């Protein structure tokens, strides 16, 4: 271990083998071993402080790296959401490189932090940590042959219980002082090693920070270019949207105007149709009323005519029954007048001179008249009695209608 290697370089390494170790001193006498135990306690306290300091430094560095990784992730998401699809693969490739580097750094820091926690736990438990031995072995100034380590780590030979008592008091301060000097040298070397590692880590962090800054600058440039392009595209989109809104508003006005005109026409047509329906209903009602009135009038007239016909038939029957001689006289009067005319004609012919009789014209005339008289007599005799019976009442009816008072109007 580191402390054992420091013992080989200290003056106590040249002591003879019969000098007892500090373990035998501390076990034999409590008084003289006090300064040695105090030196060991101070060294352990210094080691714990250095390990705690390193743990704090690594924790802070781990927090910074994680914050940087989260910031890179947020920037990557923003760029991907705003970038063109042709630029997305390049941005993704650059982000993967940075993310891999950051993940490796974080894993390395976490491994170191875990080792420091283990060292601190071992120091708190009272045993020497193995990590300090590894740090000492990594330093070429701390290398030593294994025989010397075995020589120092071996316990003292059993020389009996009187050995510690026979040790002179002058040699004890020398052993303790050499031990304390070796511990101080080991602490200084460990501190220098830690400082060198911190410097190397700081340089590495600075290099990564410079690379991250350069990448951040490139991302900012790409972000500004994408922002300008998006602003121009947004301006064009806003202009096209404004034009589309104006066009849509104009079309809406035209459509509303035409729709209003169509609605007005439909309203007018409905109104005219309603008026026409009302007019047709009124006219049909009036026509039906007139037809009904005319029908009622005709019905009343027909009923009156039927009643009048019945009355006239009854009156004609009563007249025929009450005055048959008068009807017979009226029927025979034309015959008598005809016979009178014939007699007058015959007497006139007889009174004419014979010269007229001898003439052919007169002869033909006489013959024609005689033939007509014979035909009329034969025709009169051929008419049956039933026809005369039917003809006489009808003539009487017509006569009674013509001679009677006029009927009432409708």
From Swiss-Prot:
Topology within the bilayer: Single-pass membrane protein
Subcellular location field: Membrane
Stretches with biased composition (Low complexity): 24-38
Compositional bias annotation for Polar residues: 10-23
Keywords for this protein: Coiled coil, Membrane, Transmembrane, Transmembrane helix
Family to which this protein belongs: Belongs to the TEX28 family.
Protein name: Testis-specific protein TEX28
């Amino acid at each position: 271990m580191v402390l054992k290697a420091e013992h080989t370089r200290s003056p106590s390494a040249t002591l003879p083998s019969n000098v007892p170790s500090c373990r035998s001193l501390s076990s034999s006498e409590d008084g003289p071993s006090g300064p040695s135990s105090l030196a060991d306690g101070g060294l352990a306290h210094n080691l714990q402080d250095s390990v705690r300091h390193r743990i704090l430094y690594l924790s802070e560095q781990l927090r910074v790296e994680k914050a940087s990784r989260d910031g890179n992730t947020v920037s990557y998401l923003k760029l991907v959401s705003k970038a063109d699809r042709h630029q997305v693969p390049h941005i993704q490739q650059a982000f993967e490189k940075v993310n891999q580097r950051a993940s490796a750094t974080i894993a390395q820091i976490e491994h170191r932090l875990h080792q420091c926690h283990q060292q601190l736990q071992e120091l708190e438990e009272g045993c020497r940590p193995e990590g300090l031995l590894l740090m000492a072995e990594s330093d070429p100034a701390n290398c030593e042959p294994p025989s010397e380590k075995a020589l120092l780590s071996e316990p003292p030979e059993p020389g009996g219980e009187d050995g510690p008592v026979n040790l002179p008091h002058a040699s004890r301060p020398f052993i303790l002082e050499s031990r304390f000097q070796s511990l101080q040298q080991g602490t200084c070397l460990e501190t220098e090693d830690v400082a060198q590692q911190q410097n190397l880590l700081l340089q590495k962090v600075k290099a990564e920070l410079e690379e991250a800054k350069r990448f951040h600058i490139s991302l900012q440039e790409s972000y500004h270019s994408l922002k300008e392009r998006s602003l121009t595209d947004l301006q064009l989109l806003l202009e096209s949207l404004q034009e589309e809104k104006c066009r849509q508003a104009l079309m809406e006005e035209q459509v509303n105007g035409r729709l209003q005109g169509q609605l007005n026409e439909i309203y007018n047509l409905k109104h005219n149709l309603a008026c026409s329906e009302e007019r047709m209903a009124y006219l049909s009602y009036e026509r039906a009323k007139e037809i009904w009135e005319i029908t009622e009038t005709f019905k009343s007239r027909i009923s009156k005519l039927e009643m009048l016909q019945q009355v006239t038939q009854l009156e004609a029957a009563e007249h025929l029954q009450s005055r048959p001689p008068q009807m017979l006289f009226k029927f025979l009067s034309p015959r008598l007048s005809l016979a009178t005319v014939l007699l007058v004609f015959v007497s006139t012919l007889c009174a004419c001179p014979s010269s007229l009789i001898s003439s052919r014209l007169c002869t033909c005339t006489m013959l024609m008249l005689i033939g007509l008289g014979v035909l009329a007599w034969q025709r009169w005799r051929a008419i049956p009695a039933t026809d005369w019976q039917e003809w006489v009442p009808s003539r009487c009816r017509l006569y009674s209608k013509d001679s009677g008072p006029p009927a009432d109007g409708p």
